[in-house]
Amino acid sequence: MLILTRKVGESLLIGDDISITILNIRGNQVKIGVEAPKEVSVHREEIYHRIRDVKDEQQL
């Protein structure tokens, strides 16, 4: 796992077309912005797991 330190307003890039920007830090919460092409799905981890679980159930 790559671990990076960023400040508010700073970004990191994934590949050529995904940008993640730190928008705000308050206590133990970090607000981030994600810019990605429309064909790239972006989900919070817990939502992704729900989507995957529903798809798995539908295949049974």
From Swiss-Prot:
Keyword match Lipid metabolism: no
Domain of life per record: Bacteria
One Pfam family it belongs to: CsrA
Subcellular location: Cytoplasm
GO molecular function annotations of the record: mRNA 5'-UTR binding
Record's subunit section: Homodimer; the beta-strands of each monomer intercalate to form a hydrophobic core, while the alpha-helices form wings that extend away from the core.
Task performed by this protein: A key translational regulator that binds mRNA to regulate translation initiation and/or mRNA stability. Mediates global changes in gene expression, shifting from rapid growth to stress survival by linking envelope stress, the stringent response and the catabolite repression systems. Usually binds in the 5'-UTR; binding at or near the Shine-Dalgarno sequence prevents ribosome-binding, repressing translation, binding elsewhere in the 5'-UTR can activate translation and/or stabilize the mRNA. Its function is antagonized by small RNA(s).
Family of this protein: Belongs to the CsrA/RsmA family.
Protein name as catalogued: Translational regulator CsrA
Highest classification ranks of the organism: Bacteria, Pseudomonadati, Pseudomonadota, Gammaproteobacteria, Pasteurellales
